[in-house]
Amino acid sequence: MIKAMALSSAGVVSHLHPPSFSSSSGLSVNRVLFRNRNASPCGLSLPILNPSRSVLVFARGKNRKGFVSSSSSSPKKNKKKSLDGADNGGGEEEEDPFEALFNLLEEDLKNDNSDDEEISEEELEALADELARALGVGDDVDDIDLFGSVTGDVDVDVDNDDDDNDDDDNDDDDDDSEEDERPTKLKNWQLKRLAYALKAGRRKTSIKNLAAEVCLDRAYVLELLRDPPPKLLMLSATLPDEKPPVAAPENSSPDPSPVESLSAEDVVVEPKEKVKDEAVHVMQQRWSAQKRVKKAHIETLEKVYRRSKRPTNAVVSSIVQVTNLPRKRVLKWFEDKRAEDGVPDKRAPYQAPV
């Protein structure tokens, strides 16, 4: 559109300054633009100009195959595209890369023969030789993998990596490496003890005591019990269902005579007295009878004794209530006090003074 407007403006300028060159049709531009020079310029007629190639390219680029132009594009974007098309007006039409790629694929499919034969063994050997030369391995075809890896090299690399890791671990944990040193061959008594433990089960066996007994590392004993070797399994299957012999302590005396002298007849088992179930009030009375008489209680009893050597039952009940002493204890105290003072048990009849 901008190009067409520019061309139309150029025609108007040519009206003001008419050029002297002639058109391709053999008629002068003056004749085409102004048929009557004496007449007023209101009857202006412009020649029909063919659109330039760049405008056609720009218009065609909008409607290319495989691209859908959005109707909601902003006018600024359209203006920018039109300016780019105007700048590249003199260039040739650029091909779409996707269309060129599809065209190449179609040509390859057309040229491709459907009767291709499978790869023969000779071609495979030739390919293996080329890979060997490229990798610098040699002519050994068995060590070469067609996917680009060499089996021998991979094994060597893996071994080297493992060796490196082992070296690092040994440098970092020297103490662990010393603890992990395991005997190459177990002795018969160690195998027998481990077989008994395997037969009994790990849950019923103290791993710590077992490791100390067989003089092995605890981790190694655990590994043997979790994944026992075939020899240990066979030995465990042949063992009878008996407990292993308990080793005698070193400090024990070899003569077992004192142990045998103790027989069941000599040992006398004293029967335990069965505690009878007693009532609460009986237990309370026994406890109160064992209660110690305090000094304040004695003072109260002495005050009552000064007033009456033989207190009545009401007075005794009040004393029991105040002192929380048992009744028998109170009566016993009064009897002992009368015996100390020499008061007779029976009261003598009253005699009037003469």
UniProtKB/Swiss-Prot annotation:
GO biological process assignments: abscisic acid-activated signaling pathway; defense response; defense response to bacterium; defense response to fungus; defense response to oomycetes; induced systemic resistance; jasmonic acid mediated signaling pathway; regulation of abscisic acid-activated signaling pathway
Highest taxon above the source species: Eukaryota
Major localisation: nucleus
Subcellular location: Nucleus
Alphabetical UniProt keywords: Abscisic acid signaling pathway, DNA-binding, Homeobox, Jasmonic acid signaling pathway, Nucleus, Oxidoreductase, Peroxidase, Plant defense, Repeat
Stated induction or repression of this protein's expression: Constitutively expressed in healthy plants but repressed in response to infection by necrotrophic fungi. Repressed by drought and abscisic acid (ABA).
An annotated GO cellular component: nucleus
Biased composition (Acidic residues): 154-181
Chain positions of motif Nuclear localization signal 2: 191-198
Annotated protein name in UniProt: Protein OVEREXPRESSOR OF CATIONIC PEROXIDASE 3
UniProt short sequence motif Nuclear localization signal 3, positions renumbered to this chain: 293-300
Region Disordered: start-end pairs: 65-98, 151-186, 243-264
Role, per record: May modulate chromatin structure by regulation of nucleosome assembly/disassembly. Homeodomain transcription factor that mediates jasmonic acid (JA)-mediated COI1-dependent and abscisic acid (ABA)-mediated PMR4-dependent resistance to infection by necrotrophic fungal pathogens (e.g. B.cinerea and P.cucumerina) and bacterial pathogens (e.g. P.syringae DC3000); this resistance involves at least callose deposition. Required for the P.fluorescens WCS417r-triggered JA-dependent induced systemic resistance (ISR) against both P.syringae DC3000 and H.arabidopsidis.
Portion annotated as DNA-binding: 286-345
UniProt-listed Pfam families: Homeodomain
Positions occupied by motif Nuclear localization signal 1: 63-70
Alphabetical list of SMART domains matching this protein: HOX
Gene field: OCP3
PANTHER family: HOMEOBOX DOMAIN-CONTAINING PROTEIN, ZINC-FINGERS AND HOMEOBOXES RELATED
CDD domains hit by this protein: homeodomain
Record InterPro entries: HD, Homeodomain-like_sf
